[in-house]
Amino acid sequence: MRKSFYTWLMTERNPKSNSPKAILADLAFEEAAFPKHTDDFDEVSRFLEEHASFSFNLGDFDSIWQEYLEH
């Protein structure tokens, strides 16, 4: 079974980094409502588009998701 996207993303936290992946990891960590137990692209993407209290470049999200799938 694949790790949830959130669990995988948390391994990329680095407040000193300017990489999109580290930025998203830090934002997701601070977002209490972020979907933590899913590996479903649509669920995470929909959350980022409609419910997140922060904005994030969805093109960068697509690239990060692809890296998650290749992990």
UniProtKB/Swiss-Prot annotation:
Transmembrane segments: none annotated. InterPro entries: UPF0346 (IPR010673), YozE_SAM-like (IPR023089), YozE_SAM-like_sf (IPR036806). SUPFAM superfamilies: YozE-like. Pfam families: YozE_SAM_like (PF06855). Belongs to the UPF0346 family. This is UPF0346 protein SPD_0837. It comes from Streptococcus pneumoniae serotype 2 (strain D39 / NCTC 7466).
